[in-house]
Amino acid sequence: VDLHQHRLDLALELGATHVLDGRAADLVAQVHAITGGGANYSFDTTGVPAVMQNALAALRMTGVCGYVGVQVGNLELDGLALVGKTAIGILEGSADPQTFIPEMIRWWQEGRFPFDRLIERYPMSQINEAEQSSLSGGTIKPVLIPS
């Protein structure tokens, strides 16, 4: 799910079986139709409350939603949408870096995790450009390089 077609195209190229436009009014219904009743897992990196709610609503019973991006302040979730489901906040992948980082490097070496296609490097002096590119959808994950 994304708002930018080039990101959806990249997802298909990297192995996604379905892509959906995040602006669709019936987004949750589309996920339920594709998955036969809701996803087992959903994952939100935006921290946008409406998107976070959709990520939870897209789950089937016993589904798990992982939230990476969050905003400061309170978040309202429909209590009924949470019944029978799990919502977890994720920090640094909720993994042991001593194990996880070497594993990700191995995946990259095997061609299974092409993170180099998901990032764009910016010198620290271009921090504003990096943020703008991220917000406009031009860059999936900007990486700032210290001078």
Predicted stretch roles:
Residues 25, 37, 53-57, 98-147:
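C-terminal hydrophobic helical "lid"/dimerization subdomain
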Residues 18, 40-41, 63-66, 86, ...:
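Structural motif
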Residues 2-3, 22-26, 46-47, 70-71, ...:
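Short beta->alpha linker loops
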Residues 49-112, 146-147:
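Glycine-rich phosphate-binding loop and adjacent beta-alpha segment
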Residues 19, 87-89, 118-121:
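Conserved beta-strand scaffold positions in the cores of enzyme catalytic domains, especially
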Residues 1-54:
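Adenosine-nucleotide cofactor-binding segment
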